[in-house]
Design a protein with these regions (language model features):
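Eukaryotic scaffold repeat domains enriched in small/polar residues
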Residues: 17-381
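Positively charged n-region of N-terminal signal peptides that target proteins for export
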Residues: 1-4
Length: 381
């Protein structure tokens, strides 16, 4: 008898004004690390099943082995060769090679499995083009970043009419191409410059319940662009062909007093779970009347790929749908299903045939689980 699939597709009642999506249910995990993390920013699977994890608050850059439970730090913070100023996300490149942008020192570290083997200096063409801020990398020799206009001095507010360029830079030659334009997240910014014109102070406060368009580069070179109006996913192939997704059948939720109270309650719970030791400065406080006309369909910055290469987008919680859930959109721009998780769980990264989930306990400590995910779980994109 065939083994039970690690992912089972069920049906659920249709959302109001939308088609009936399939629920993709994860089976129990097959591995869990007992080491607690404080703030996980990336998980990168190696071919032997170990993972590289970045935890900039505590453990920094580590390699973890599910079989032995061993978690070992790689290098250390510092300015020397192979050291880093900040444990930024690790990106897979060819084979078991990876890169980590050390943007505080305007350089890039290259890894072979669990060893840092080279440091790319600030005069490299890739560093100059991206200023050290590398958002994604692929296995065919490119990195991706954003290129925005210089912010004006004083206080300004970006709107959904403002955009930024998604740029691709070839690691070998430094050639830069603009792949797409994406709308930025509406944000109030305050900039102060010194006599030389350099930024001496900067603050930013995203407007409440507003999101910008998002993009992701898959290791195979495909670019996913998550559009906001209408909510859809456009795909760009490595050779430049675009597949424009149709509007996703997700209901538009109008802002109401019920939604406002639900949002304020979510914010209060988050602040209680993550108390700040310093008061919030006035320019970063959200005005009481700062509400959009409609709820955004997704949360900013909580996207990832599935093992098949579909894009997974975390749904914006609402009064009627407060739980943690992810839309799964295939490479034709179709809604393939939805994954529902517990309130203390987040889907974090894909592996070759696995999905990695981060669970948070009552002390705000984070633990990594691995769930099997066969490639037959979803239709191909």
């Amino acid at each position: 008898m065939r083994n039970v699939l690690a992912v089972t597709i069920l049906s659920i009642p249709a959302l109001v004004g939308a088609q009936q999506p399939a629920v993709i249910k994860l089976q129990p995990h097959n591995a869990r690390l007992e080491t607690a993390f404080t703030a996980i920013t990336s998980i990168r699977e190696l071919s032997d099943g170990r993972i590289l994890v970045t935890d900039p608050r505590d453990l920094q850059l580590v390699v973890a082995d599910f079989r032995t439970g061993d978690v070992r730090q790689i290098s250390r913070r510092g300015g020397g060769p192979g050291e880093y100023g900040f444990a930024a996300p690790v990106h897979a490149i060819a084979g078991d090679s990876s890169l980590m942008a050390d943007f505080l020192q305007r350089r890039v570290l290259l890894l072979d499995q669990d060893k840092i083997v080279a440091t790319v200096a600030a005069d490299n063409a890739v560093i100059r083009a991206t200023q050290g801020f590398i958002t994604f990398a692929d296995r065919v020799g490119n990195v991706v970043s954003q290129k925005s206009s210089d912010p004006p001095e004083g206080q300004s507010t970006t709107s959904m009419k403002d955009s930024t360029a998604v740029i691709r830079v070839a690691r070998r030659t430094g050639r830069m191409d603009t792949l797409a334009m994406v709308l930025v997240r509406p944000t109030v910014r305050t900039i102060t410059r010194n006599a030389k014109g350099d930024i001496s102070f900067s603050s930013a406060r995203p407007l409440r319940l507003r999101v910008g368009e998002q993009f992701m580069l898959h290791p195979d070179g495909w670019l996913a662009v998550i559009r906001i109006n209408p909510f859809r996913v456009d795909w760009r192939s490595p050779d430049g062909r675009w597949t424009l997704g149709a509007p996703l059948p997700v209901p538009v939720i109008r802002m109401s007093e019920k939604e406002k109270q639900a949002s304020l309650a979510r914010t209060a719970r988050s602040m209680a779970a993550n108390p700040s030791s310093t008061p919030i400065p006035p320019q970063l406080r959200t005005p009481d009347d700062d509400w959009p006309d409609v709820m955004p369909p997704y949360l900013q910055g909580e996207t990832l790929f599935s093992p098949e290469g579909h894009v997974m987008i975390r749904r914006q919680p609402s009064a009627d749908h407060p739980g943690v859930a992810y839309f799964v959109v295939d490479r034709r721009g179709r809604l393939a299903g939805m994954i529902e998780m517990k309130d203390n769980e987040r889907i974090f990264a894909p592996g070759a045939r696995s999905i990695y989930v981060v669970e948070t306990d009552a002390d705000d400590l984070r633990y990594i689980r691995r769930h099997p995910w066969p490639h037959s779980a979803l239709p191909p994109g």
